[in-house]
């Protein structure tokens, strides 16, 4: 069982994801990040479309949407809806929630998510049984997201 010093559990994948597009609802992510506009009091909803490769016990491609909400108090809430397509042709639904913490003075966020994986595939039935915690970083300037997931 592979372990990370800061996280318990078995490491089941590492992902290198790209932010392929952003849908905004009245205020753009760029305007917020550059300081042109503040996050409105009611918050800002952004749909982040992601796609990329994952390696590990669960290897393949992940693509989907994070219905992200930037709050006026600085917190970022995550609402993940992703499809995992394994290298051997199976599909796994990934849903999750969590939060991201912006770093001061740089376009980076630290990501903390609570993940649920579900599938009817016999070969991957093991993903249905356990909780997954993931941690990572997002570089909002380059659109690169790196996440590592641990089965509890």
Predicted segment positions?
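Beta-strand-enriched cores of mature, soluble protein domains
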Residues: 1-152
